[in-house]
């Protein structure tokens, strides 16, 4: 942001008063911390509003840098999600002022550049004033001496080279004249770059100085007033952290499920040699990944793992996409973790063929996945620590935390339901593991292996061994991963954290909903798989309803907003 003297700021406000009729001559000048982007603004009743966590805030003037063809997808040939639908209608209806006005991009058209000097002289009638302005050198016709002042030294990684730049200065016009701001912006162009759309992300510092160098002087500056912009965080930021937190948590649950199954089977999970508990491990993995169970399929193991790898890559991609849109929330260290996860995602996408089928063999997939999964889990654990220790606990972060904890509860329920046969409609306690086999000890062994899978997937096996020091049992194991509020990996602990964050946001209905879910879990006995299935179904439905309420109550713009204090 260029430095703006007091006179420049005052003139900017004065000009905004002229541009904006909707503000009644008193527009607010507000710098939004993150953004705003097109998704942060919405047009209702022919007026523009900022979607913030405190509700919709009216926008009187928009200072835009977007190209003319990317302003309003409803009226110009915009592609993708660029622009704000209905913005030009609001501008024509005088519901918002645009600076710069739509169509002013023609001033930057290179084809018209050679005519602007003559146009300026004709408009002002003072042609002599332009004699002191350098004539524009039109490349490539200009000779080297004319091009030297358009190139600046730049470091390309090996040494200093000449690079062309695009320079942009900022001026504010008023009745008293024109104020030139003390700073500008410059972008370095790579060879072959279009000056209008440079690809390089390298910038240069720009200072605007007068014709003579003034002696250095120290001036005392009055401290700027402290303005808390936390309530003006665009809803997009909260939405990105909410969905990003969910994707990050689901990726961790999925990666750990795959690692646990691979570790306990040593990669030998072919259907013809697998023991019955392995089938339930694959059911658990399919449930967590959200892919078909493929029961009875001879190639089920390879297909399930290939689908799991693909699902993990998609979850990481979703998280990275959301995180990139709110990059200003994350520290530099977190940025390194995001880059490592992006590299891991690229590696995962090479593990399956284009049609989603597995690679050469199940063993090969297991070996490759084992290395990649360990790296992903370490990076996700590091990022989770940074999430809790480095991000400021503002409203946007709280929505991200709600998303993470909700997804953790969903993951626990999916894993338990899948492992114990609830998704295939054959609960573990009702199954005959081997036809005609009455060996109860053998059946107990199979059940214990399934229970160990659930505990290990939720990082609770060590806690179980330390607390009970006995063989794993269904009731105590399920209570530990579902109902134990002191176990941070348990569903109840996650829901309790959701309730806490809802309370900090002042959302009483959310507190009531989560309190009801905790009461259901607390009253459950988990004596059998069937009774557990009833509880898990109720809790899952309640969490899903809560997630939908979050989106509907906070992350969706109302159709008919009204400003407080205005007729």
Question: Residue locations for each model-derived region?
Answer:
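Alpha-helical transmembrane segments and their helix-helix packing motifs
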Residues: 1, 11-26, 114, 151-567
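Domain-scale recognition of functional cores that engage charged ligands
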Residues: 1-196, 214-218, 259
């Amino acid at each position: 942001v260029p430095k703006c003297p007091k006179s420049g700021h005052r003139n900017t406000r004065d000009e905004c008063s002229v541009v904006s009729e909707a503000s009644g001559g008193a527009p607010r000048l507000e710098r939004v911390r993150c953004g705003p982007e097109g998704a942060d603004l919405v047009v209702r009743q022919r007026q523009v509003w900022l979607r913030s966590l405190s509700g919709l805030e009216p926008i009187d003037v928009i200072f835009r840098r977007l190209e003319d063809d990317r302003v309003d997808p409803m009226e110009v040939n915009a592609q993708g999600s660029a622009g704000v639908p209905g913005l030009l209608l609001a501008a024509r209806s005088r519901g918002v002022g645009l600076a710069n006005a739509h169509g002013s991009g023609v001033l930057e058209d290179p084809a018209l550049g050679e005519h602007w000097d003559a146009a300026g002289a004709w408009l002002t009638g003072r042609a002599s004033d332009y004699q002191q302005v350098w004539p524009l050198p039109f490349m490539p016709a200009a000779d080297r001496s004319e091009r030297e002042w358009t190139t600046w030294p730049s470091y390309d990684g090996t040494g200093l080279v000449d690079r062309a730049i695009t320079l942009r200065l900022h001026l504010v016009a008023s009745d008293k004249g024109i104020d030139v701001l003390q700073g500008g912006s410059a972008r370095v162009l790579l060879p072959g770059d279009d000056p209008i759309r440079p690809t390089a992300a390298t910038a240069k510092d720009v200072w605007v100085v007068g014709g003579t160098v003034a002696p250095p002087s120290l001036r005392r500056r009055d401290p700027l007033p402290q303005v808390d912009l936390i309530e003006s965080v665009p809803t997009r930021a909260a939405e990105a952290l909410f969905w990003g937190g969910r994707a990050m948590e689901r990726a961790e649950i999925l990666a750990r499920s795959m690692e646990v199954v691979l570790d306990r089977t040593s990669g030998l999970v072919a259907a013809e040699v697998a023991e019955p508990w392995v089938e339930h491990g694959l059911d658990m993995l399919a449930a967590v990944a959200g892919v078909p169970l493929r029961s009875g399929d001879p190639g089920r193991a390879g297909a399930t793992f290939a689908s799991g790898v693909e699902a993990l890559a998609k979850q990481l991609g979703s998280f990275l996409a959301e995180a990139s849109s709110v990059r200003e929330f994350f520290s530099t260290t977190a940025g390194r973790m995001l880059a490592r996860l992006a590299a891991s995602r690229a590696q995962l996408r090479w593990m399956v063929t284009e049609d989603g089928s597995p690679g050469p063999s199940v063993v090969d997939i297991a070996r490759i996945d084992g290395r990649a999964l360990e790296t992903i889990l370490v990076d996700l654990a590091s990022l989770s620590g940074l999430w809790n220790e480095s991000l400021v606990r503002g409203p946007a972060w709280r929505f991200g935390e709600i998303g993470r904890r909700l997804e953790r509860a969903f993951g626990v329920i999916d894993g338990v339901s899948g492992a114990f046969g609830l998704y295939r409609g054959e609960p573990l306690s009702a199954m005959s593991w081997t036809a005609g086999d009455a060996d109860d000890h053998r059946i107990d062994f199979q059940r214990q292996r399934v229970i160990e899978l659930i505990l290990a997937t939720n990082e609770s096996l060590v806690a179980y061994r330390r607390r009970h020091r006995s063989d794993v049992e269904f009731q105590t194991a399920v209570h530990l991963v579902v109902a134990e509020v002191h176990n941070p990996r348990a569903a109840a602990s996650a829901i309790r954290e959701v309730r806490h964050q809802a309370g900090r946001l002042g959302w009483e209905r959310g507190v009531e909903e989560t309190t009801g879910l905790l009461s259901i879990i607390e009253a459950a006995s988990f004596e059998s798989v069937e009774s557990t299935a009833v509880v898990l179904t109720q809790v899952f439905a309640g969490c899903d309803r809560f997630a939908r309420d979050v989106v509907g109550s906070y992350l969706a713009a109302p159709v008919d907003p009204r400003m407080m204090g205005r007729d």
